[in-house]
């Protein structure tokens, strides 16, 4: 059975297949595309992109229609800044490919990606410049270059680190404005479907085929993929938003696909996007009051922190907020209920997506919701479910591995043909590795299928022959006031086959007076009051200071599981990963 978007949804416009991203954005909403900050005057994005492209062309000897795009790979290794997107679009303007690198990535991982792509040019910021220079030297690339992006907090300050002669993007733009115009991109019909725009690192939280270095795969995302997803998401929200623009909070890293697509999406539809260099809770809350922000794009751990520390929301005026969009991790109904109690006027809109789908697959319509679900498929997406026996699911409310088709799906993984073959089936469907269910509602006379992600396929455990999803336990524990963060993995058990094991970061302010054993007892009562026996934890709870995490903040469950495997089989206390420790 093929599951599709709601039949009542609006019709999607044709997706341009022969235009680069920056041309598509400027063509649609040039009146909105301004680069504004309190430190420098407003300039059109188009002007800045073109001037930077001219400078890069002169500096590097590149031109838009000469040479392979793979000979013009440029990395961006920086925290968020207004010129992050300007730099990426300037790279596209001269026919190049932009490789994203997360600021928390190790030097070894960045070096591996540079060697894989033969990248010799990096955009970075002053705080990351030493690492960037170290990697460029260690990679032994010819004629390495590093250019500096200014972060808001760095503007007007004396640099704490020497620049070592690197030019800033602002200097390049100023110089480029005086240079002759460069030729327009001359693309063949349909070239946008083949031309890679971004190389995006995947999260790798399950450790699938990863080495000890945990080098992430690079998803090849084309111009067509990004443009398609902009149109898909905007079309779906055209009904609820009725063409109205919003002021949105943006602190999600642009180096991660979720943050990247949101920045493109809000730019195209004309929203105001208040960009933060990095996440800081107090700064984010203050900006809500200052800019009267209406929409928050959050991830579940941040929502959990707000729910467990509600006093934070009283530090500033947050009355302007009307909606919270959440993704990049499971968001259970218990956490939604907890947020609703703290801020009942905020409408929570869960969604689902992957780096490999660039990015958005489902969005919640604020008028038609299903508690605990992840929204409806956006236009252009098709889905299938394959059950544990390898058979296709032919009904609603039956779980199976989610397979997808969408115009936004990547070309594949760079340099990893085996991984690419494994992630696509023989008919070209993307295997997500997520277990999902489609559920129907009939609100307002509209029959609506809702996507509900149950768990990661490889994270599902079997307890006494019954399938148990860690996300169910996690969502219950996340709603407990003493829990700041939680990750549940399956461990071997002689009697049941497997049992759930919870790693928990305690909230520093709530129930802090309880000793560990008393809190474990309270957590067990919390779980056992609502979940069946296969979900119970009993002694399988351990408190830690922090989790090993991926670059986008997801707990690395495979590291937690590795630390437990040997010790749990011997019925001894499990070892804690290197970057965690007991309370």
Curated annotation (Swiss-Prot):
Superkingdom of this protein's organism: Eukaryota
InterPro entries in the cross-refs: AMP-bd_C, AMP-bd_C_sf, AMP-dep_synth/lig_dom
Outcome of gene disruption: Eliminates the production of fellutamides.
Protein residues bound to ATP: 202-217, 350-355, 434, 456, 554
Ranges where the record places region SBD2: 351-413
Stretches the record annotates as SBD1: 280-350
Gene3D superfamilies xrefs: 3.30.300.30, 3.40.50.980, Luciferase, Domain 3
UniProt pathway: Secondary metabolite biosynthesis
EC nos: 6.2.1.-
Induction comment: Expression is positively regulated by the secondary metabolism cross-pathway regulator scpR.
Keywords, sorted A to Z: ATP-binding, Ligase, Nucleotide-binding
GO molecular function: ATP binding; CoA-ligase activity
SS bond partners: none
Family listed: Belongs to the ATP-dependent AMP-binding enzyme family.
Biological function: Acyl-CoA ligase; part of the inp gene cluster that mediates the biosynthesis of fellutamide B, a mycotoxin that acts as a proteasome inhibitor. In the first step of fellutabmide B biosynthesis inpC activates 3-hydroxydodecanoic acid to generate 3-hydroxydodecanoyl-AMP that is then loaded onto the T0 domain of inpB. The 3-hydroxydodecanoyl-S-phosphopantetheinyl-T0 is sequentially extended with L-Asn and L-Gln by the two CAT modules of inpB. The linear lipodipeptide from inpB is then transferred onto inpA for the addition of the third amino acid, L-Leu.
The record's note on its domains: Both substrate-binding domains (SBD1 and SBD2) are involved in the substrate recognition, and are sufficient to confer the substrate specificity.
Name of the featured protein: Acyl-CoA ligase inpC
Organism: Emericella nidulans (strain FGSC A4 / ATCC 38163 / CBS 112.46 / NRRL 194 / M139) (Aspergillus nidulans)
Source organism phylogeny: Eukaryota, Fungi, Dikarya, Ascomycota, Pezizomycotina
Name of the gene encoding the protein in the UniProt record: inpC
